């Protein structure tokens, strides 16, 4: 004989209330994910103006930029025809800087010189020292970039080109499903975290993050974590998945394209590590379920 249980109306109302909250929360999260995805795609198609990169590019332009040279020269000629009376110290500093950059064939110097402070006079000698610092710094940075390009193989970029070449040679008329598959593969190689891509392109970081003689992040967390749910997430990852997550997050937050950011909050770093690790775990579960269905 089957037993039947009667659920009180109060409990039913509470259950309906929680289900409604969960549904609304899921709808909000989905909407936010779609919004972020749209922002990311728009930023790739129409990249935002990056002030730092523009400053570097413009101030390092070659001397053949006739328009800027003529503009600065006319400004200098106009300055010489005007009496220097009744002008503030800040204007004097700017004009001194522009005169210096004309003489030394440098441009946009005012973007690289700190604002004048009370009692401080910026002289051409000080500007010389500041420019020497910037020249040495940018020169060493550019040299480091050239050496890195010569010593490392751009795995992700090469794989994207190989993927596009192979798919285009096999079939010129791609179906929407095939095009979507190509897009997904490129996203895994370039935008989204992918353990295989990170591991292959890690280069010299492999020696620092992947060491068989030291305890892995996975084993360390299994020893330290108390919550069984957290342990299940860690167990579902590969031996060095968490190390790949760390490389991905660090390269995402600390790179030359985010120089305008003065700092990264520790809370933001920890949150990004946590979200990326859990997202990778969920993706692995979904992939496993998909394989089992097939």
Swiss-Prot record:
Natural source organism: Zea mays (Maize)
Protein name (database record): Uncharacterized 33.9 kDa protein in mitochondrial linear 2.3 KB plasmid
Cellular localisation: Mitochondrion
GO cellular component terms attached to this protein's record: mitochondrion
Keyword Mitochondrion tagged: yes
Keywords: Mitochondrion, Plasmid
